[in-house]
Amino acid sequence: MLHTIGILIWIIIKILVIVVPLLLSVAYLTYAERKVIGYIQVRIGPNRVGLKGLLQPFADLLKLITKEIIVPTRSNKYLFVIAPLFALVPSLVGWAVIPFQEGVVLANINAGVLYLFAMSSLGVYGVLIAGWASNSKYAMFGALRSTAQTVSYEIAMGFALVGVLLAAGSMNLTDIVNSQKGGMLHWWFIPLLPLFLVFWIAGIAETNRAPFDLAEGESEIVAGFHVEYSGIGFALFFLSEYASMILISTFMAILFMGGWLSPFEGITFLDQIFFVVPGFVWLLLKISFFLFVYLWVRATFPRYRYDQLMRLGWKVLIPVTIVWLVVTSLMVVAHVKPWF
């Protein structure tokens, strides 16, 4: 009995070690977004609360927590309240299979890629439930847009994943990282460049980020699926969006950029200098790079029209992935490096 309780406590501690830093990362990602976009637009960004505005995320959280939760009169109250949790939970439980470095993973399962792909796709159910339960036409339009967008881009994302599985020969995330050993030139983003770009574009669309933020297009459908949410409900949707961004960036770093591996492997003098850097630091740097690109894209590109969004998904991304999957399959069968 005591042994079982001890195991349970240890599992809870490991979960908290992942979730607490993740929630803090989400808080400061919002701060980084406002700062980065501010500098791109030749503004300063938040600079009043704390040193250089570093306490701004906590001020925003306090504001949202103290706001009144308003439930629309004819809405489905139970689904309305629970929908933000449906959106948030998948972006948190996906971290169970993320390897931070060799052996440092909560659950080292053989179907890690499949599990993570499923978790990254489940968030759309929260969006759909929120749109329907709100009893608002704007919320419903936003939810339908988001659902159609996710279904469209999941296909391209799934095909891009298959390319990595063919090249690495495993669905275990640790094995996929180990298959990229040998330095930056051995990372999968080089031989699978078209699939890498498609996966990245589909990842932006999956998380409803600009320029694919049709689900919450302010100029067309007010705030989209969360137009009726205020206070903590809105905060949970906000949290789920940024947590999903971090999860997709981590997925990208593991699949295509060598995960925790150093980019200087194979370059003797640089490898000796950076040998002391822990693997998880390299992973965090790669995640930070992808998150910066997220913010850069948001500040640079205008929002797509809905028909353009669908056309890009079905007529461009899916054909590209199918063609490159055929190429990858032929290279693997022919034992051509670095595909094999």
UniProtKB/Swiss-Prot annotation:
<dbReference type="GO" id="GO:0048038">
    <property type="term" value="F:quinone binding"/>
</dbReference>
<keyword id="KW-1278">Translocase</keyword>
<dbReference type="InterPro" id="IPR001694">
    <property type="entry name" value="NADH_UbQ_OxRdtase_su1/FPO"/>
</dbReference>
<keyword id="KW-1003">Cell membrane</keyword>
<dbReference type="GO" id="GO:0005886">
    <property type="term" value="C:plasma membrane"/>
</dbReference>
<comment type="similarity">
    <text>Belongs to the complex I subunit 1 family.</text>
</comment>
<keyword id="KW-0812">Transmembrane</keyword>
<keyword id="KW-0472">Membrane</keyword>
<dbReference type="InterPro" id="IPR018086">
    <property type="entry name" value="NADH_UbQ_OxRdtase_su1_CS"/>
</dbReference>
<feature type="transmembrane region" description="Helical">
    <location>
        <begin position="184"/>
        <end position="204"/>
    </location>
</feature>
<feature type="transmembrane region" description="Helical">
    <location>
        <begin position="244"/>
        <end position="264"/>
    </location>
</feature>
<dbReference type="GO" id="GO:0016655">
    <property type="term" value="F:oxidoreductase activity, acting on NAD(P)H, quinone or similar compound as acceptor"/>
</dbReference>
<keyword id="KW-0520">NAD</keyword>
<comment type="subunit">
    <text>NDH-1 is composed of 14 different subunits. Subunits NuoA, H, J, K, L, M, N constitute the membrane sector of the complex.</text>
</comment>
<feature type="transmembrane region" description="Helical">
    <location>
        <begin position="316"/>
        <end position="336"/>
    </location>
</feature>
<dbReference type="GO" id="GO:0009060">
    <property type="term" value="P:aerobic respiration"/>
</dbReference>
<protein>
    <recommendedName>
        <fullName>NADH-quinone oxidoreductase subunit H</fullName>
        <ecNumber>7.1.1.-</ecNumber>
    </recommendedName>
</protein>
<keyword id="KW-1133">Transmembrane helix</keyword>
<feature type="transmembrane region" description="Helical">
    <location>
        <begin position="78"/>
        <end position="98"/>
    </location>
</feature>
<feature type="transmembrane region" description="Helical">
    <location>
        <begin position="273"/>
        <end position="293"/>
    </location>
</feature>
<comment type="function">
    <text>NDH-1 shuttles electrons from NADH, via FMN and iron-sulfur (Fe-S) centers, to quinones in the respiratory chain. The immediate electron acceptor for the enzyme in this species is believed to be ubiquinone. Couples the redox reaction to proton translocation (for every two electrons transferred, four hydrogen ions are translocated across the cytoplasmic membrane), and thus conserves the redox energy in a proton gradient. This subunit may bind ubiquinone.</text>
</comment>
<keyword id="KW-0830">Ubiquinone</keyword>
<feature type="transmembrane region" description="Helical">
    <location>
        <begin position="151"/>
        <end position="171"/>
    </location>
</feature>
<dbReference type="Pfam" id="PF00146">
    <property type="entry name" value="NADHdh"/>
</dbReference>
<dbReference type="GO" id="GO:0003954">
    <property type="term" value="F:NADH dehydrogenase activity"/>
</dbReference>
<feature type="transmembrane region" description="Helical">
    <location>
        <begin position="113"/>
        <end position="133"/>
    </location>
</feature>
<keyword id="KW-0874">Quinone</keyword>
<feature type="transmembrane region" description="Helical">
    <location>
        <begin position="4"/>
        <end position="24"/>
    </location>
</feature>
<keyword id="KW-0997">Cell inner membrane</keyword>
